[in-house]
């Protein structure tokens, strides 16, 4: 009688094991959650902030306060979906050489009453073999 239950027990164990796997491993090309401290996420976030500041018509730089959420998708490279909080700084954009990310992060914030915080959604497409990143989507409010 024990032998007749064996063929049923093995597939059930396999099914249970598959259900316990993280969902991201089961969906090739699907979105996977990423740690906001992951070095690749940090690099994509730096790029997004740099691009935001170069595209923005605001007279002042915005710096990264925090990465709220990060996801990635395997495409021809990796696409990072980032939700970030940015804050307007006291550093004015002067004509000439624009500030780089690390310089912007060192900019002082205005007093609390004058602070302007944005929540931004960025999509950054990374293709490391081409040494190329591209901001494919951006929305801030």
UniProtKB/Swiss-Prot annotation:
Residues 29-129 form the Cystatin domain. Expressed at a low level by the venom gland (at protein level). GO terms for molecular function: cysteine-type endopeptidase inhibitor activity. It comes from the Eukaryota. PROSITE patterns: CYSTATIN. It is found in: Secreted. Residues 1-26 form the signal peptide. InterPro entries: Cystatin_dom (IPR000010), Cystatin_sf (IPR046350), Prot_inh_cystat_CS (IPR018073). The record marks 29 as: Reactive site. GO terms for cellular component: extracellular exosome. Inhibits various C1 cysteine proteases including cathepsin L, papain and cathepsin B. This protein has no toxic activity and its function in the venom is unknown. It may play a role as a housekeeping or regulatory protein. Negative results: the recombinant protein does not inhibit calpain-1 (CAPN1), a C2 family cysteine protease and legumain (LGMN), a C13 family cysteine protease. Does not provoke cell death (PC3 prostrate cancer cells). This is Cystatin.
